[in-house]
Amino acid sequence: MKILITGNNGYIGTVLTEILYNQGFDVVGLDNNYFEQCNLTKVNNLSNQIIKDIRDVSIKDVKNIDGIIHLASLSNDPLGELVPKVTEDINYKSTIKLASLAKKTGVKRFVNVSSQSMYGISNTDKELDEEQSEKNPLTTYAATKWKSEIELNQMSDDNFVVTSFRPSTVFGVSPRLRCDIVF
């Protein structure tokens, strides 16, 4: 199975790429290597690596791909507020562009990494429920993640299955450090 991982040289992507590669998947990476100077150890050395900004993704990049794991984004609230238009372009518009190209070329599965930030500040002590809890994105980052999920869900069908998951702030050891958060 041929898997495209966007953001494969990022904090989560470096670990995920190695796991999938070691399990025998044919992994294609797409990353702009923006945080290249934040390497703790050697990062992936894929023979099938695309160095490109996610905003420039093309139909050629998704051709003959079976599934996509979409990690590429500006990955937190403070970074997303520096230039909100860029956050919108990367986190929302590029996500929808990638998914549209993928669907057009016959990609079967699209895994979207979203964020729990879309819930904002809770006004209740009730346990969080993905479907029932109110969405209250307070930042550009959170709003772009929520908008992307809404549109991706509309694109999903029997031939193009979209799954989104919403991690909270991720931490731990990775070959690519997160230089954008306080430890």
Spans of features found by a protein language model:
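N-terminal Rossmann/SDR dinucleotide-binding element
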Residues: 1-67
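Rossmann-fold NAD(P)-dependent oxidoreductase module
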Residues: 15-19, 101, 151
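Short beta->alpha connector loops of Rossmann-like oxidoreductase domains
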Residues: 36-37, 75-76, 119-120, 172
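NAD(P)H-binding glycine-rich loop region in Rossmannoid oxidoreductase-like domains
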Residues: 54-90, 101
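Catalytic helix-loop patch of NAD(P)-dependent Rossmann-fold dehydrogenases
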Residues: 82-85, 89, 93-97, 118, ...
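A short helix->loop->beta-strand "cap" motif at the edges of active sites that frequently abuts
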Residues: 105-109, 160
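Residue(s) in the substrate-gating loop at a strand-loop-helix junction
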Residues: 115
